[in-house]
Amino acid sequence: MTDNERLAQLLFGDGGLTPEDCEQRYPERGLPEGARVTRFSPSPTGYLHIGGLFGALTDVLTARASGGITYLRIEDTDKKREVEDGVSAIINGFKNFGMTFDEGVTGFGTESGAYGPYTQSQRVEIYHAVAKRLVEEGKAYPCFCTAGELSEIRSEQENGGADITGYFGKWARCRDLSFEEQKRRIEAGEPYVLRFRSDGDENRRIFFDDIIRGKIEMPENVIDEVILKSDGIPTYHFAHVCDDHYMRTTHVIRGEEWISSVPKHIALFKACGFRVPKYAHTPQVMKTDEETGAKRKLSKRKDPEAAVSYFVEQGYPKESVIEYIMTLLNSNFEDWRRANPDASCWDFPFNLKKMSVSGCLFDMAKLNDVSKNIISRMSAGEIYGNILNWAKEYDGELYSLLSRDEDYAVGIFSIDRDCPKPRKDIASWQQVRNFVEYFYDEIYTPDFTLPENISPADAAAILKKYLEVFDIEDDKDTWFAKIKEICEPLGYTPNVKEYKKNPDAFKGHVGDVSTVIRLAITSRRNTPDLHSIIQLLGRQRVLERIENAVKEYES
């Protein structure tokens, strides 16, 4: 038995799981050639970030496009940063947007799939099996350096102007300890971590092909990275290498902030005898800073929209958020959407190679436009159901009003909907209260403010004249014809073109007359079809509102 084998036995004991056992437990997946296996692997350290939804969508689309699979893995090795219900927050965040995975964690303590456990803290036996093999082969060793000693090394490097800082070369004090020294210190109970023994050379370069960014050249890794912490829990760098191998990940898709870690990850894959996966490093999700006008990364602290829960609370349909993210993922999505207006966004032929290299800009105005288009294609019944579900949790008063009379509420959302160009007033369900308030007396507050070109006296005259001809039974054409008829006696022309030719000859035109009537009934200058609104409100409420407006203008 070699010293390395004796060291491995001292560190991990006899027997136990071996890498060969893991190979049998987690065989190749047997998917069709070219099928991609991707994973989304968040840490339960807080809410699901919009960048997380962006990344997960990239993983899912990549796998689906190739006939592969995507799994959800929870990377919970950093217990200090883990928050209570962090896993549930991630799972619920995905559920709110209809995001599903083929395998992996499905809830707190639940999962599905043959390559689990899908939570890293439950896979320690696997990491120890691989770490033990690395020790046996002389590729890993125990390091007894204290925090103070490591700080001393870093200070020495920084003061000496070293190009690279870290535990390597002459600063790797425990790298070449004799087995006898290692054994003595372990048996004495000295705490230690396990480090990877790098064979990198700072003068050599590595090259790898990033699917999004093309060929990337970087210095080799020379750092003897920690792979097991003093409590035996693996570091992120080591755990994900083992997991991606035994879960048979073919494509590692992650944020561009991980590019600098690729050399150490490739070194670990090769040292373990694992096949190196394909890499794709996605751009960060950015926004324009309101104060400086410069682009910056979305901030959990500054930007409420950084959390996907924000879009749920605001009432954005899940389809709207997913579709908007699609526009960020591939620049040709919008062209595809115009050519396929009725297709599901999941039918889009997503391509990693068409992702932007620079940061993609999250634009709330653009999201609102996308969402208005999505909602405009919904039926009145679909809109009603969606709003009711949202309002039940976030606006109890609105929920009570809408659920009181379903037919009436659906009638509201039917106005200007079944037509070639449906209105696009609503971007999120939170906006519905403002949209429907004049249909419900309980939340309606009259506003009698007139346009500058119409005096209160003229407004009162228009409304009194309208009351003379008003008939709730009139169809739309008859109703509007009557509005035109009352124009001339009041000094207004029923012909807008005539007014534009000779504005001094009239007080205004039929549009001004209609505006006064619209304001009296809804307190809005812009609404869906006014005739339809009148039919829904009914004769009594229309008369009451007009009469109240007349009193206001004559007072």
Regions found by a protein language model. Give the residues of each.
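Catalytic adenosine-cofactor/nucleotide-binding cores of aminoacyl-tRNA synthetases and other
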Residues: 272-453, 522-555
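Helix-rich, typically C-terminal accessory recognition domains appended to large enzymatic cores
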Residues: 482-537, 541
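Residue-level signal for inorganic ion chemistry
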Residues: 59, 90, 134, 138, ...
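Short amphipathic alpha-helical segments and their helix-coil junctions
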Residues: 35-39, 71, 303-306, 344-352, ...
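A generic secondary-structure signal for well-formed alpha-helical elements
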Residues: 19, 94-101, 135-142, 154-157, ...
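N-terminal Rossmann-like or analogous alpha/beta NTP/dinucleotide-binding catalytic cores
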Residues: 2-162, 260-274, 320
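Glycine- and acidic
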Residues: 38-45, 71-76, 246-252, 305-308, ...
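Active-site cores that bind ATP or allylic diphosphates and position pyrophosphate for catalysis
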Residues: 133, 141-281, 286-298, 307, ...
